[in-house]
């Protein structure tokens, strides 16, 4: 039958984790992302030379699989522990949380290790899935 072709729509954490698992099972995976970059809710945007994270400001890590992945991301320089300073009533102290992490240099850094080696198509919005003569097809601005 040959290698199975699979499209994943969205290059956020879930889409890229799914693509990574499918690629590891010998599927031919293509990820389609409508924006120019990766991350979904972990996206880092740039405007006039300034970068900002419009979604999540940090992640918490509480399950063993995610702990392992964050270790990979930190070794790759894509994530770092975050201990924010808390200011309340004119007093400041470090937050007592050990499981807060940020992406480096921005939050989208966290997903970059997942995207390595994956066929990723950015700037392509998928509008519809259509059953064609050869199977399912994706409808985009450029056609099928």
Residue map of PLM features:
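Core beta-strand elements of the Rossmann-like FAD/NAD(P) dinucleotide-binding domain
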Residues: 2-4, 139-144
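N-terminal FAD cofactor-binding segment of flavoenzymes
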Residues: 44-85
